[in-house]
A protein has these predicted regions:
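Glycine- and acidic
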Residues: 151-155, 159, 219-225, 334-337
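Generic secondary-structure signature for well-ordered alpha-helical cores
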Residues: 139, 170, 174-177, 243-246, ...
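Non-catalytic, usually N-terminal nucleic-acid engagement modules in DNA/RNA processing proteins
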Residues: 1-185, 299-302
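Conserved, mostly hydrophobic/aromatic
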Residues: 24, 57, 92, 134, ...
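Surface-exposed helix-capping loop/turn segments at secondary-structure junctions
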Residues: 175-185, 249, 355-367
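C-terminal extensions of enzymes
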Residues: 1-18, 26-35, 40-43, 146-152, ...
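Glycine-rich phosphate/ribose-binding loops and adjacent secondary-structure elements
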Residues: 166, 175, 179, 187-308
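A non-catalytic, amphipathic alpha-helix used as a structural packing/dimerization or gating element
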Residues: 129, 133, 160-171, 207, ...
Length: 378
């Protein structure tokens, strides 16, 4: 396997790197903008994403499999052509949705039987099916099919689940290699990331990290966090796992998180992030600023002539006032959501740019502390 990830600079444990993909080079640390159904909720287009500095878009295997179906996407030339996005795309494996959305599910060695959350139809998904769907989607990076273990879970259950996730990963790798060698595969250079699981048990996490590292995959994710555990537990697990993952591969913390979480995780050696929070919060008028979070629904913004954030260069802040955007929300105008989602994603993407600059300059710790102070609720 050719070397894709280059560690350019370390500042403490914080890593500044670049990851070469068939769809462009990713500068890390990076925040992936979540477009579950191949679009960001809030009427944000792929052209908008480029304007606000998005490097990587993340789409959801489970949802796209159900609608419009991965076969439709494949017939349309893969996700990149389908959504008109020529930069990297990561698809998750569908595992998290199978376990979180489906009340009716049976986990077997071969995979998971579950009911569609749309129409109740019985569906089966295992490692091979997840790889086949992601190959049809033709994403840049495919995630391995795993069980996202609920928190809390007993030690015995976690041990059994992690062992099965390892066996599933082996099957994912074999199937991915097979698919990438086929003549009719859209993206023959599709990459595979493995996922570390183990709940809040450090020793299980470490043993699993060592096991999956032997498979020499393109990257490694820490999964099963941000599912109800405390921030202290999350940081403890990251501290335990990162030293046992390869230094020459990217490390991805799945589903995390708040700007504060990102600063802390970067300080612990994490490279990739994704979270629905910026878009979801934006759709409800909750916006991130250089001075912390604001709720634009608040009556105090009714006559506020300032932009959302006076230091921000996003499309919303360059052209509109807090008063106007608040009015749009009260009038239930779709533009309100669009402007706030654009602002929040720009805020996250800009934060990652500043993080990379701080690591490059060797002042990441000072940068982190300064940001955390600025964001304290005033």
């Amino acid at each position: 396997m050719s070397k894709r990830y280059t560690l350019l600079k370390k500042d403490g444990k914080a890593r500044r790197g670049q990851f070469v993909t068939p769809h462009g080079t990713i500068q890390t640390p990076v925040f992936m903008n979540v477009g579950t159904l191949a679009a960001i909720k809030g009427a944000v287009s792929s052209m908008d994403l480029k304007e606000i500095g998005c490097q990587v878009e993340l789409s959801n295997t489970y949802h796209l499999h159900l609608r419009p179906s991965d076969k439709v996407v494949a017939k349309m030339g893969g996700l990149h052509k389908f959504m008109n996005w020529d930069r990297p795309i990561l698809t998750d494996s569908g595992g998290f949705q199978v376990f979180s959305l489906s009340a009716m599910r049976k986990i077997k060695e071969e995979g998971v039987y579950f009911n569609s959350h749309i129409d109740g139809k019985k569906i089966f998904m295992g490692p091979e099916e997840s790889m086949q769907i992601q190959s049809n989607l033709a994403s840049t990076i495919a995630m391995a099919f795993d069980e996202c273990i609920p928190n809390p879970s007993t030690r015995e259950y976690v041990e059994r689940s992690v062992a099965r996730t390892t066996r599933w990963l082996e099957r994912c790798k074999i199937e991915m290699d097979r698919l990438n060698s086929k003549d009719d595969t859209i993206n023959k250079e599709q990459m595979l990331f493995g996922i570390n699981q183990g709940g809040v048990y450090e020793d299980i996490r470490i043993a699993h990290a060592k096991e999956i590292t032997k498979m020499d995959l393109d990257g490694y994710a820490i999964g099963g966090l941000a599912v109800g555990e405390s921030h202290e537990d999350m940081y403890r697990i990251i501290d335990a796992v990162v030293p046992h993952l390869p230094e020459d591969k990217p490390i991805y913390l799945m589903g995390v998180g708040t700007p504060e979480n990102i600063l802390e995780a970067v300080d612990r050696g994490v490279d990739f992030f994704d979270c629905v929070l910026p878009a979801r919060n934006g759709r409800h008028g909750n916006v991130y600023t250089s001075e912390g979070k604001l709720n634009l629904m608040n009556a105090k913004f009714e006559l506020d002539e300032k932009p959302i954030d006076e230091t921000c260069q996003c499309p919303a802040c360059k052209h509109y006032t807090r008063s106007y955007i608040r009015h749009l929300f009260k009038a239930k105008e779709m533009l309100a959501m669009r402007l706030c989602v654009l602002h929040n994603l720009y805020f996250y993407n800009k934060l990652m740019e500043e993080i990379r600059t701080a690591i490059d300059g060797g002042y990441y710790k000072e940068f982190k502390e300064k940001k955390l102070q600025e964001w304290k609720v005033k």
